[in-house]
């Protein structure tokens, strides 16, 4: 996964990204000349320009949140109206990268300390609570990090913290890579999301860290035992992203969490073994794994049949048990799935369980398929049967509320999605939606090599009926002339 950007705009809501720039409050009016007015032709007409200062405080604070913290503080010099506005913004971003980029190396150490001291004052002067805080720092100010973390958690009750260590290189022998923080530094009840980039992981900051629901670790160095203990201490995790370089591969990495729903793993170095035991897991996103073996106990993903484990390496693969859960949760998952490692496009295969009668689930499937720019290797589809129970928090649209997604202006799948081989399980030829999906795969050239439909496990009568429907699929005009359609 690509190292997360620490810019203020990337950590803020996309809805604010198009906010117009601030206008100077002391520029009260401006002379504009116009030739369109017969009365005012050739005369100077004064129009008030500083309408932005008349906006409500909440709106001004949202606008300021789109700026870096340094720029937001500078706006306090515009007028009395702006003096305290920055002090209540819900998002703060401390970004020190420009110190290294724009100054000689001999001055970086001194300037870093000056900047850190000013940011300490800024944090102390801020009023109210924070939604998020991003700290992108360089190695010279590690002494300030612990103090800042305590301030933003205990005093500001920040919900989301992002820490990025901007250093030139990563080696296990450089001490400043270690994240030396106070015991239980990340254990404040308000903190629910934590992202760390380029650190050597230590356990003490995570003691009894049951408050975290989201943990993202990018370019992290850690012993397997330390990482296992950190995951165990974060007992309420729902989302876990691991991009790890292990220092000690002797033991097995254990991920045992009763609440974990999303797991994404990437590591370029060989490890011994990974053991996953997560009863609520619905997404297992493997970017790359090199290890002697792994085991996964996840009931919602156990029905998938395909195996992409070959010779100590797993091909990139995404397993997703689709359900119509809260949109905010699904949005977070999709954002993590679309993020790429080292700017590489998503490749490999996809396994999904989906009810194509449910428009909500079909919409989610559309979004997932859009993650592939190029041709997908394998697509495994497990159709949910009609008696599948509705999960907690899931909605289901029936009757006239259903829309036929294979009709209309934007049919699904679109004309650009391509996959080499599709494997279908629980296919019911009498189901209008399932047959329509298979038909589109055939006729518009979605599948380029094989469409494989599992029928051998059906009772004799159902097997005959299903294979008769498959025969109808074979009679359809093929988007790819040499497409092979088989029952197995």
UniProtKB/Swiss-Prot annotation:
Disulfide-linked positions: none
InterPro entries in UniProt: F-box-like_dom_sf, F-box_AtFBL13-like, F-box_dom, F-box_SCFL_complex_component, LRR_dom_sf, LRR_FXL15/At3g58940/PEG3-like
Span of domain F-box: 49-95
Pfam families named in the record: F-box (PF00646), LRR_At5g56370 (PF24758)
Recorded superkingdom: Eukaryota
Region Disordered, annotated ranges: 1-21
Annotated PANTHER family: OS06G0556300 PROTEIN, OS11G0201299 PROTEIN
Protein name: F-box protein At3g60790
Natural source organism: Arabidopsis thaliana
